[in-house]
């Protein structure tokens, strides 16, 4: 039995239903099972106050970080004028900027001021909670808060803290980061290469990329769910969900359980719903989040163009049950998933695929786009789902109709999928790998 450790999680936020926050909660569950104590450093937090250390500037959408990112990744005069309008107090930061590849000295100065401030806060965090190890959740992976990433790198270099860097989304995986004026910072800190860091990635492609690009080895730990504890049966509260989501008794509930962002490929779900030719309604469970509303407008227009009934139900699908200000019942995804006739997952890019595992956990039939990680890591396991390659074909429609019209066979395949996921993506697997990582961090036997 390894001794209890005090472990600090660091990220830009631990709140809501984004993938990083969800996976952090799962890691915390396992670590606490192993008798470790967990604490949180971030810019936004919904964890208990007594274990949290919140620094607003650590959030990647803090106004000052927003201004830095506009200069770093959106170096056009249009973006600069927009930045002046949104943040007039930072007008001086933009005066000498003329190319996305050149960084104004004023921006460099402000990055380092924030880096120093955030590093001091990291020291306070470590001392306040008497931390023994750190787990960095994506803050040293995707360069959305450059000062925080630099602060983390310097803190580790100065202290030699045992660190697990849990990577979700690398800069090289996102087009928006290709042209920038912060290549020196990305090379230094996203990800950093330091001897006390153990790197963890979600999939085999990332493991290959981080080795070739950063020269570091990594352990693969995919997303997980608690497949050792099957979902409970529906209770009376959940039974009204279909009606509250606007479905009539004869309609099929097609669930798109993701945020409304472009890489989720929601147009494919709308097209599928239209071309199936059956009474059906597409329910999108999450809002656009903090990545803008342009794509959401596009989805509204596309659904209207194809005359598809789409319900945008983020208002009544949340983290916990409750009531909206208007008096509507709020349901969890656990209330909605078991009542879905079909789950769509048409993403074009994913680090792994939380929604895929959720659909398997709730034993729902699933339509999946062959995104790269699915093709490389998930598909070879032998899951039985409807697949398509970038567009909805007649074969996709035929297979989907067959799934909907043959519930007994679908139930058998769902059980098969559940058992596969239990083998490869369970909390038991996560517990074993975290035990190995922590033992390595502290020089112990796993």
How would you name each of these model-derived features?
Residues 248, 293-335:
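Nucleotide-activated donor-binding/catalytic signature segment of Leloir-type glycosyltransferases, i.e.
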Residues 239-243, 247-264, 270-273, 283-284:
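Conserved donor-binding/catalytic core segment of Leloir-type glycosyltransferases
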Residues 172, 185-240:
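Donor nucleotide-sugar binding/catalytic pocket of nucleotide-sugar-dependent glycosyltransferases
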Residues 365-369, 385-386:
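Short hydrophobic beta-strand element within catalytic cores of glycosyltransferases
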Residues 348:
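Aromatic "clamp/platform" in nucleotide-sugar-dependent glycosyltransferases that forms part
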Residues 3, 30-33, 37-133, 305, ...:
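A conserved catalytic-core segment of Leloir-type glycosyltransferases
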